[in-house]
Amino acid sequence: MRRDFVYNNNAMFNPLTTHYSSDMNWALNNHQEEEEEPRRIEISDSESLENLKSSDFYQLGGGGALNSSEKPRKIDFWRSGLMGFAKMQQQQQLQHSVAVKMNNNNNNDLMGNKKGSTFIQEHRALLPKALILWIIIVGFISSGIYQWMDDANKIRREEVLVSMCDQRARMLQDQFSVSVNHVHALAILVSTFHYHKNPSAIDQETFAEYTARTAFERPLLSGVAYAEKVVNFEREMFERQHNWVIKTMDRGEPSPVRDEYAPVIFSQDSVSYLESLDMMSGEEDRENILRARETGKAVLTSPFRLLETHHLGVVLTFPVYKSSLPENPTVEERIAATAGYLGGAFDVESLVENLLGQLAGNQAIVVHVYDITNASDPLVMYGNQDEEADRSLSHESKLDFGDPFRKHKMICRYHQKAPIPLNVLTTVPLFFAIGFLVGYILYGAAMHIVKVEDDFHEMQELKVRAEAADVAKSQFLATVSHEIRTPMNGILGMLAMLLDTELSSTQRDYAQTAQVCGKALIALINEVLDRAKIEAGKLELESVPFDIRSILDDVLSLFSEESRNKSIELAVFVSDKVPEIVKGDSGRFRQIIINLVGNSVKFTEKGHIFVKVHLAEQSKDESEPKNALNGGVSEEMIVVSKQSSYNTLSGYEAADGRNSWDSFKHLVSEEQSLSEFDISSNVRLMVSIEDTGIGIPLVAQGRVFMPFMQADSSTSRNYGGTGIGLSISKCLVELMRGQINFISRPHIGSTFWFTAVLEKCDKCSAINHMKKPNVEHLPSTFKGMKAIVVDAKPVRAAVTRYHMKRLGINVDVVTSLKTAVVAAAAFERNGSPLPTKPQLDMILVEKDSWISTEDNDSEIRLLNSRTNGNVHHKSPKLALFATNITNSEFDRAKSAGFADTVIMKPLRASMIGACLQQVLELRKTRQQHPEGSSPATLKSLLTGKKILVVDDNIVNRRVAAGALKKFGAEVVCAESGQVALGLLQIPHTFDACFMDIQMPQMDGFEATRQIRMMEKETKEKTNLEWHLPILAMTADVIHATYEECLKSGMDGYVSKPFEEENLYKSVAKSFKPNPISPSS
């Protein structure tokens, strides 16, 4: 048997992505003649793949893929990797088609066998029936489209009705309100000129003339009249004075004896018949009048027929007071001050008719107005109930006529039912005709499909081979990751155990250097495997609560030492609008930030690196960069500015001007305008990372996000890196439903930004029931303290204020030490000797502001002398902010009066708090956390626990046992799944089991399933609940996923090599913290 590898020099094969070019496919199938004869390498079963030359693998990888200086190293790597993988495949007897395992004769036979009858050829007789079925389906779809368009037309028709009805209701209310205001003004006029003038300036003739001449202001009123309040004992004198008798409204007879009357004394000529009639003689009228004077507001009657027009109308009544009322009068004060009542009659029917006559489309709808004060018996105010209308559709609009006691509404309907729209009549037949034609076209195309069926089979074969190659690639990556990470786990574990022993400084330095290198190698492997998982579509994001600000502070701490060594400003700012806790994949979010900040630190030698986080909608118009590389800047336009200082974080020019103070101050000023009614469950963040580094050449900007690509060949030599971080970051951002882009100017710097959609997480209860979020608990001892920050750079000062604000410190920013002296002196003058009053607690000075001039030391001494002279308060402490500081500068700062502690950058809230506790000589108190949120240490979780470690590798067993014993656990080791089953026979005394997944004979999944089966059988027999927490241990980062572990019955997952944080997250779910003695 022979295995033939057929390839040509133009074929492209990438062991990581397994992409075949068209040349390779045709060469594999020997289907077409090439200009150059493909080279055949024949290997028999007895031969080894090791006999392949490096040049053969170089040609397999593509002749032009490698530079001459890089060929030997990269060729040997892939050669050894592929040969090693082939040897493993031979040993495991796995049959995967990584390359074509057939010769030319077999290829020709296969191509000949594929030429047979196809599905369409075999079922040609069914094609007419299929066409008829197609026409029926098109008919059903056409009817569905008709129904959909008809429903849409009904919705639009309803929207128009709603708009027209609401418009009429608003206009009716507005016109009614105008008339009510005029009646109110007339009531005030009567009160002023009839009761406040002596003698009265109003009589019947004056009132009638005035109301007649101002009737144009009250077009909706048929008339107005004024009735005076008359009590019973004043009735006789009142009747003699007016020379008429008070009469009832219904019959015109003398009014019977009552406690109080309201006879009309003034009236408009149109309602002169109301003179002498008692407005309180009717029961409902009496109630309305009493309600008006008690509330001081206008009241309405129920609808009734007006005497002259016989139209439906209502009477509006206003109280008239004879004296001025207090600001908030009581009901008794209103009644006592009442002098009379001004009433106006509204002709509702005429009002609505006039309104509808002014509007377009009046004939299209039917309008009814109701009084629904009594909901069970609504009263018709306007409209004919028997009028013909489309009763299938109606809209109701509420009416407010100013009387809260009475309720009104307007109901609108169309006069006629909706006709079938023209677009429906044309679209549906057109769609049916098109569908019918499509059916005939498909029927004719069926014969053509028969002719291309052979090509389809050919492509199907290529697809099968590509899938087989993808399986081989996945297994290759899984095996390589396991085989590399397993010994690396042993190396890093042993180094960690070595560092726990007594070592000399030189030995410790060697061990720590080896540990750092090992972790760097693991990080590189993880990046390559992440890229592979992304290409395979197997990378998924988790959703857990986490604290963005804590994540960013942690990232800054990773690069703090390097930024100090380079004397560059490294800072972060998070908008107050960004929620404190969000839900998402904290690890992947952190990975993106680390990649971007790491690149900035790597390529920046001076200036600053500024990380800013805010809501993408917060400044959408001005903050979102243009969706183009470099913001559309051409190479001819890039000129390095000669300006010496810029309003940026460090004063150096940046590629993107949005983080300068002119733009940044608008973002800061909007911090307090957080909307409370945003009900969206998601939050869209924008994160920008600005640096003043070397920038990216224009010619390289198009390939920045391509994997394994860098600006040029010198980048890797000078700065290191693989060029894979940005491509992974781009994929992760897209998984977070965001986008990433950048603006870069050579020799100026770069600004990368990305957006990410995360979930809001406002309830602490949701956090407690999930994986513990990465939340930083800051000290609360600084709340209410006051500080002055001296910094001439406004952006940097705003960042400092942000971190101080997180600690609860109120900050005032000044630009110079002279201003600080003035501010401290003003504070001293305005201060209070009472200890409970606020005082100035600290003055924090930026190093740049201190060393900028020689006179600043004298200003510091003056500041100390002024503040120390206040006997009522402790003098504020002076502290210095610095990115780095020399010994001479430190000695000078101490002699000038600064505290011994210098707050080193990059600033983080926790670090500032720790330094200020030293500066202010505060006693460090244990943080008080909400119940259940205080993080337990691994020692408190594992002390006294008996744990079984199952692993076939003796080094891994020693590493795992050493790591667990370090935290007080009692460890027993087993070398296989069978031994573990023997030790875990119920009853046993183990508290947990750490189970390796890939073991010979019985893997960890099978061992776990059998353990769970034993526990289930024990429960069925003895009714005793047994559940041993089992945590998976594996170096295989592709197959050993969290879901697979849960499916087999495991409780958690720990990836090799062990990290203390990951170990804690896993065991914290199964164990509760034990109290441990302080000595331990």
Swiss-Prot record:
Autophosphorylated predominantly on His residues. Activation probably requires a transfer of a phosphate group between a His in the transmitter domain and an Asp of the receiver domain. Kinetin binds at residues 285, 307. This is Histidine kinase 4. Changing residue 303 to V: Loss of activity. Changing residue 494 to L: Constitutively activated independently of cytokinin. It comes from Arabidopsis thaliana. Residues 146-429 are extracellular. GO terms for biological process: carbohydrate homeostasis; cellular response to phosphate starvation; cellular response to sucrose stimulus; cytokinin-activated signaling pathway; defense response to bacterium; embryonic root morphogenesis; osmosensory signaling pathway; phosphorelay signal transduction system. Changing residue 285 to A/E/R: Loss of activity. The keyword Transmembrane applies. It catalyses: ATP + protein L-histidine = ADP + protein N-phospho-L-histidine; O-phospho-L-seryl-[protein] + H2O = L-seryl-[protein] + phosphate; O-phospho-L-threonyl-[protein] + H2O = L-threonyl-[protein] + phosphate. The chain crosses the membrane at residues 125-145, 430-450. Trans-zeatin binds at residues 285, 307, 317. Dihydrozeatin binds at residues 285, 307, 317. Changing residue 301 to I: In wol-1; locked in the phosphoprotein phosphatase active form, retardation of the primary root growth with reduced cell number and exclusive xylem differentiation within the vascular tissue associated with abnormal vascular asymmetric cell divisions, impaired metaxylem and phloem differentiation, and reduced cytokinin-binding ability leading to impaired kinase activity and cytokinin-mediated activation. Changing residue 343 to L: Loss of activity. The modification Phosphohistidine is found at residue 482. It is found in: Endoplasmic reticulum membrane. Its EC number is 2.7.13.3, 3.1.3.16. Induction: Rapidly induced by dehydration. Down-regulated by Pi starvation and induced by cytokinins. Cytokinin-binding is more stable at 0 degrees Celsius than at 20 and 37 degrees Celsius. The gene is AHK4.
